[in-house]
Amino acid sequence: ANIDFVPFAQWDDLPSLEGVLDLSGCTFSPNSTLDLRLVAATRLTELRGGDFGGSLRIDASSLTPQPEAMPFGITGFKNLDTLRIAGFTHISELSLPTESCDDLTIENCGSQAPFTLSLPNLVEVRGTLLCRNCGKTGEANSGSLPRLKSVGRQLSFYVGASSFTALEFPLLETVGNGEPVSDDPADDYALYTMPSGCAGEFILPSLQRVNGSMLVSTWNTSTDRAVAFRFPSLQSVAGEISVGHTAYKNRSVATLDFSALTAAGAIRIGNLSSVTDFSTFTQVLPRLSEQTWSVTDCGYNPTYQQMLDGETGAESK
């Protein structure tokens, strides 16, 4: 017999559950939310989603002791409204099966060990994809989203004091829908990344459009490893492109690649002391102005007029 769930189902503790919790035989109301809050060790070994298409939230912030691996497997849950995983501070790996969802949040996970995040099947996030405060400081954390093609509202990969030595979004093509993501202009970025800890180059090889503003932040000076930020297919950014930081100086990044860019609302680059060549922005110059072009505290700081005159820094190489 089917089990009828009310729109919101919550378990504050799971010690009474064991083995496999299979939702495939359950009937859920539209827009149902399944909220699992772990406060003690569970004997649950697997959570099967079946055709569940509501919201799944798993919170281990109060779980004691913290497990070093996910205490149960997660299967199914291919298409969801919202998916949120939080508070698994000691796990070293998190892999999720979801293919599409409205919003996806992963936060405060893997802060006590080198952390690997994998979303091997994820193709689309229709709203916001947020990864915040994950990974252990000073360790080789990594994130892989090999099939992700689009994020509808905002992609925010905010790692805080930690860093990711590898961030892979090889098929990502579009981010943003043109709607503001924050009332504060300082946080209104459709694409927000902190990739300066990446080994070698940070590259989004397939990204073509950002329907909003984008920030490539070098806030974390203690983990600067990336030597290049590359967006070789990026053609248009509806808002502002900001690269660097207003206060913290980065010395590792020497190359910027925006070679396909033909449209942008503004370009602001700061505190990249090893960057001296800005010829990559030549194609987009006609769409800019003196007010929408700013380079400060870099290895070379060309004005808009200098760029128009061909003094891009490439000639000094």
What do these predicted regions represent?
Residues 1-13, 18-43, 48-121, 126-144, ...:
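Concave beta-strand-loop units of leucine-rich repeat
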